[in-house]
């Protein structure tokens, strides 16, 4: 990648434990900037979308809007048990599930709360995925990734991808979007 990857962070409905860990990962103690990571508040400038918390009826449109405003290529990282599958809030009346109920996810970071080191590992893995997507776009400029085209886990998404680095174990949870199983 010829430029530093810019990330945008969004916290859905959660206990804010993972949200705090994402912020901790951006502090000098963990020094995410050594990988060239820059935090931005503008989706049009972001390459990597880091999401914590669940997707619910109130924030699903926000999650989708941020995703759609990002330019291709883009990577989505779901951080924490809530973002991966709904977590402890999964059975709440307004919770639809994890991030993959709304948009395709490329990397999952299970844990409650997820460790800052695991978040950094996922973002670094996301840089590799971003490079792959950029190369694919050069090879086929007409190809564009549509939400849901690769299934619930996205083109690269898997539990094992970041699970070993995270040192945590997660389990997939089926989610419901508009009454259908994803």
Per-region residue spans from a language model:
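Iron-sulfur-associated redox domains of electron-transfer enzymes in respiratory
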Residues: 1-182
């Amino acid at each position: 990648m010829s430029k530093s990857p810019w990330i945008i962070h969004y916290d859905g409905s959660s206990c804010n434990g993972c949200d705090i860990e994402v912020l901790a990962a951006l502090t000098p103690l963990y020094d995410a900037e050594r990988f060239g990571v820059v935090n931005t508040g503008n989706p049009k400038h972001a390459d990597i979308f880091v999401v914590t918390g669940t997707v619910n009826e109130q924030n699903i449109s926000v999650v989708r809007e941020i995703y759609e405003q990002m330019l291709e290529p883009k990577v989505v990282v779901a951080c924490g048990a809530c973002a991966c599958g709904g977590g402890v809030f999964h059975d709440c009346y307004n919770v639809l599930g994890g991030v993959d109920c709304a948009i395709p996810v490329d990397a999952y970071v299970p844990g409650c709360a997820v460790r800052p080191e695991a978040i950094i590992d996922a973002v670094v893995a996301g840089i590799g995925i971003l490079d792959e997507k950029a190369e694919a776009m050069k090879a086929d400029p007409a190809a564009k990734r549509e939400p849901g085209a690769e299934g619930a886990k996205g083109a690269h998404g898997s539990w094992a991808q970041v699970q070993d680095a995270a040192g945590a174990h997660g389990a997939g949870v089926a989610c419901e979007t508009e009454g259908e199983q994803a």
